[in-house]
């Protein structure tokens, strides 16, 4: 399975690094390519860059930095980096902070998964709610392992008009998962 990994926090962010490591370590032997923003691009929604050039450069083997938005990253990956070998799934994240309810409208993380779906490619967004107790922040490893273990099943849930949006609390491990539809924050 070929996986394109991106985010909106930047290619050096802890969340994408943890997810990249978990996917590469998975026994399934996933082929993982990272194309992610060169800096934090949080809350840019489905923005695309139109008034300046968008550049990509390989900063490590298989890891590309992009000067544009998360949607630009998906576009450049498909047109420049993954030419001839398109991904089977685009995984965006792990975002530091939740993407729930109407917040998904503003999320660059979710927008990248949505862009994949618009191309007919399965799209998965993964976000983590930080632990506020004692300022411990996000612990990405458990969610990274969960996504790596279940990426095929999660990709199968995506369709021509459905992306998968995962939100989890920082934890050591996850015992179960549940499905929910997007709801407004007014509920």
From Swiss-Prot:
GO cellular component, one term: cytoplasm
Taxonomic superkingdom: Bacteria
Gene3D superfamilies: Survival protein SurE-like phosphatase/nucleotidase
Any GO molecular function: metal ion binding
Main location: cytoplasm
EC number annotated for this UniProt entry: 3.1.3.5
Cofactor annotation comment: Binds 1 divalent metal cation per subunit.
Compartments where located: Cytoplasm
Signal peptide extent: none
Cofactor: a divalent metal cation
Keyword presence, Nucleotide-binding: yes
Role of this protein: Nucleotidase that shows phosphatase activity on nucleoside 5'-monophosphates.
PANTHER family xrefs: 5'-NUCLEOTIDASE SURE, 5'_3'-NUCLEOTIDASE SURE
Protein name per its UniProtKB record: 5'-nucleotidase SurE
């Amino acid at each position: 399975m070929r996986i394109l990994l991106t985010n909106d926090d930047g290619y050096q962010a802890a969340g994408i690094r943890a997810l990249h490591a978990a996917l590469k370590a998975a026994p399934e032997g996933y082929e993982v390519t990272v194309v992610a923003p060169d800096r934090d691009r949080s809350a840019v929604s489905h923005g695309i860059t139109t008034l300046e050039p968008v550049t990509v450069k390989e900063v490590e083997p298989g890891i590309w930095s992009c000067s544009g938005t998360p949607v630009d990253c998906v576009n450049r990956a498909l047109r420049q980096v993954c030419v001839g070998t398109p991904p089977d799934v685009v995984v965006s994240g792990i975002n530091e902070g939740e993407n729930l309810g109407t917040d998904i409208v503003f999320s660059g993380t979710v927008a990248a998964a949505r862009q994949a779906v618009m191309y007919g490619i399965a799209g998965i967004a993964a976000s983590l709610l930080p632990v506020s107790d004692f300022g411990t922040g996000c612990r990405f490893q458990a969610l990274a392992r969960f996504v790596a273990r279940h990426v095929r099943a999660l990709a199968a849930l995506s369709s021509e008009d459905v992306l998968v949006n995962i939100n989890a609390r920082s934890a050591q491990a996850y015992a179960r998962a549940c499905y929910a539809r997007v709801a407004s924050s007014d509920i």
